[in-house]
Amino acid sequence: GSSAKLNFELEERRRFEDDPDYEIVIGIDLGTTNTVVSFMRQGQIEVIPLDNGSRLLPSVVSVNKNKKFDVGGVAKRQLLFNRDDTFFSIKGFIGRRSKAIDSELLKNYPFKFVVSGEKLQVYSPKLKKKFDCEEISAQILKKVKLESEIFLKKENKKCVITVPAHF
C-alpha cells in the first residue's frame, strides 16, 4: 500500500537528484500570450519558475539596443519604447500561409510583417533582417530550455510542446 508508494517516491527522488542519466521530459505550453513549462516529479506535475520566479513567461521577443534577443518580461517591457522590434502574439501565425491571413489584422501590430512567397515574416529594423514566425517562437523555446535546465540542474534533451488545434 502506502509504504510501497513511499518507497517508489523515495527511489524516484534519489534517481532524479543523483543519477546523471535520469532523463527528465519537460512539457512546454507555448502560448500566444504566455508560455509555461513543467515536469513530473514524484508523480506530481511541477511548474518551473521562468521569468524572475514567475511561472508564466510572457511570449514576447524583442531585439534590444545591443542587437540581441530578449525574451519574456524584459521583452514585454520594451513594448513601451521599442515597439518596432518587439514581437508578440506570433504563435497564431506559425504554419499559416500568408494568403490565409487577413492583411487588415496585421495592421493592428506595432511591428512590421512582410510577406515572402507564401510565408509571413516579421521585420527587425535594428537587425535589418526578416524572421520567420517560427524563428521568433524558437527564441522563447531557447529561453525556456535554458531556464528549466538551470532550475533542474540537468540538461534537457526531451520535451513535449503543445500545438494549436489548427495544426
Residue ranges, per PLM feature:
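N-terminal phosphate-binding loop and flanking beta/alpha elements of the actin-like ATPase fold
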Residues: 1-58, 65-167
